[in-house]
Amino acid sequence: MSRQSTDTAVSSQRLLASAIGVAITAIAAPQAAQADEAGQKKTDKDRVLSLDAATIVGEQQDETTYNVDRSASKKYTAPLLDTPKTVTVIPQQVIKDTGALTLADALRTTPGITFGAGEGGNPAGDRPFIRGFNAESDTFLDGMRDVASQTREVFNVEQIEVSKGPGSAYTGAGSTGGSLNLISKTAKQDNFTDAGFTWGSDQTRRTTLDVNRMIGDNAAFRLNLMKHDAHVAGRDEVSVSRWGVAPTVTFGFDTPTRATLSYYHLSTDDMPDYGLPLTNVNRSKANPSKPASVDRDNFYGLKDRDYRKSTTDSGTFRIEHDLNDNLTLSNSTRLVRTTLDYIVSNPDDSRGNVANGYVYRSAKSRNSTSKGWVNQTDLKANFETGFIKHTLVTGLEFSYEDVHNRPYAITSGGGAGNTCNARLLASGDCTSLNRPTPGDNWTGSITDGLAYTDTDTKTSAAYVFDTLKLSEQWELNLGLRYDDFDTKSSGYQTAGRNGPAGYFKRENNSHFWNYQTGLVYKPAPNGSIYLAWSTSSNPTGETGGEGQADISVGNNGLDPERNRNLELGTKWAFFDDALSLNAALFRTDKTNARVASPDVSTLQVLDGEQRVQGVELGFNGKLTEKWKVFGGYTYLDSEIRKSTVKSDEGNKMPQTAQNNFTLWTTYDLLQNFTIGGGTTYVDKQYGNTANSTYIPSYWRYDAMASYKVSKNVDLQLNVQNLTDKRYFDQVYSTHMAHVAPGRTALLGVNFHF
């Protein structure tokens, strides 16, 4: 059984903390003497940001901006103002100002994203739903699919791009509601050191170090380090611990050939939390189940049994060469290995004990290793055909992923059964609903399980994108992609929904085309109106690498689900491009959704239809030189239009908030003093297609104040969930709802040299 050594973990954490301290001391001493010069240099250059992460060296961009005007992905062949698609870029400054410490924290600054709960696979924070559709397998890193199940941090993230609507022409399999593109920090043409120390409520301690050094005139090295430990506000016994390191080196600044080599490591060691049980086991649409009315801090896990540990190691090499002024060839290769190991208590698991004042601790586990690689080649060209100007990108993409999972065999110490009684209470398998005891002496056993699954997924793809400038007012944006998606699943299964116990082997091979087209009209240089059409495909086994179920006997022979999107929108830039506003009307249809067969319960058929239509508004940038805003609003009208379960027809889609509003704003009261605040509204969400489980709507408020002590030192105070609101941010289809953290105060001290 691969439970990691606690002593080893502690030693690694102490080693990292010591390394950060030594590095800060060593670097700060000589830098202090050059503080004035470095501070002036930083002001003059505005700290160059490598925006085009798929391109080794990008355009310079103000790092303090709330408004980014161009995507980092090569596949977007026009500025965002002229891109016929809703794309929200969460810049570094928004991540800093909001005090975001996780990917989920950062994503809450943009509307139209909710988070799903699940029994296994990825940590729930890495399971976003975009415009009502699951996007957990639609996360990209620097324009390449981030293969393998993993936990993601923000210490090495420069910005986050959220693309809305079906986009398989850009991404391949998935991206029905949209996709995420995380842009990592790379070496810059500058010398600087940033060190941050954060102390907070609930024993929060976070240390970060970001060092960039030029190596001669045309190369640079950058190192990011992070150590984070905290308990979770409002939740007994729940804690998180993680550390990470990310070195990167770039060669060839200001030359025709440029290359970057990067490495990333993240280790986590958490006490997992599945939240509170749902109440009504005899639930229905007319009588839906909601979270139990108990104290928010009630924790139903076992602190001496439950754990979750993960590691991520990835290495990336990117190179590009300018063949001439209008033609650039680039290639990127990434190798990834991740591990995910946990045992967690699912509160009650729909066993009906809640009505009697008890909770059954249903143990869930995973012990997986994922390995994979991605290779992507792009050719970017600028040329003219007659009066038409083209910006074209064409490329090839190949990827491979192997996931091995052998869950643990967990045996109750109280014998068979899951209805709470004196025997199961004594063994620690059950606890009180109102006064749970996470310190119970659990008397069961944990061994390596007999069942295991190996899932291999291979993808080969070719694509082309072109922005055709027909005139000063008209542009045509086109994209086309072909995918060969092959996934195989084999292993040993115990008796259950996939048949009798024994060895199995299943395979699904899918070939699909996807496209997008958009017509852009520019009534003025600072504005655009567009009409766009796009498609996406969801093949069987798409989420296998992200911790979800392997290919089953019920779906291994099915064709991909197909999705299409029609969007009418407009984008405008004001105040010399300091402020961006956008609005869009859209309709996304899934025309052949996988649903249960009406004839054989273990099989699925492509006989469902789903629709999400609505409106999205967005704003980001400066209203004045002192006042910044970032946020938006979405209205999502979701509907299950057709299903083999007739009672589901007309219902709302799960994990879809009809109304979602986000606002973050800051104001410079003085030259060195800034205040800020934010609010988020998320509407009611259902946990399943039957609409028989739900979590209620909520408002959340946040606040911030920062003070520049000098050009080298600043302070920042964040208070998240200012009113200590008790709310739920994830709901599962049958069992539980995740409790969001309570009020959290964070005080950061940051040094810049």
UniProtKB/Swiss-Prot annotation:
It comes from the Bacteria. Residues 1-35 form the signal peptide. CDD domains: ligand_gated_channel. GO terms for molecular function: porin activity; siderophore uptake transmembrane transporter activity; signaling receptor activity. It is a multi-pass membrane protein. Pfam families: Plug (PF07715), TonB_dep_Rec_b-barrel (PF00593). Disruption phenotype: Deletion decreases sensitivity to siderophore-beta-lactam drug conjugates; phenotype is complemented by ectopic expression of PiuA or PirA, or by heterologous expression of probable siderophore receptor PirA from A.baumannii. In a pvdF and pchA double mutant background, in iron restricted culture, growth inhibited by 60% in the presence of dopamine and delayed in the presence of other catecholamines such as epinephrine; growth is inhibited further, but not completely abolished, when pirA is also deleted. Residues 190-753 form the TBDR beta-barrel domain. One of its GO terms (biological process) is siderophore-dependent iron import into cell. The keyword Chloroplast does not apply. Disulfide bonds join C420-C430. One of its GO terms (cellular component) is cell outer membrane. It is found in: Cell outer membrane. Residues 79-185 form the TBDR plug domain. Keywords: Cell outer membrane, Disulfide bond, Ion transport, Iron, Iron transport, Membrane, Porin, Receptor, Signal, TonB box, Transmembrane, Transmembrane beta strand, Transport. PANTHER family: CATECHOLATE SIDEROPHORE RECEPTOR FIU, FERRICHROME IRON RECEPTOR-RELATED. Involved in the initial step of iron uptake by binding iron chelating siderophores, thereby allowing extraction of iron from the environment. Probably involved in the transport of siderophores, including host catecholamines such as dopamine. Belongs to the TonB-dependent receptor family. This is Probable TonB-dependent siderophore receptor PiuA. It comes from Pseudomonas aeruginosa (strain ATCC 15692 / DSM 22644 / CIP 104116 / JCM 14847 / LMG 12228 / 1C / PRS 101 / PAO1). The gene is piuA.
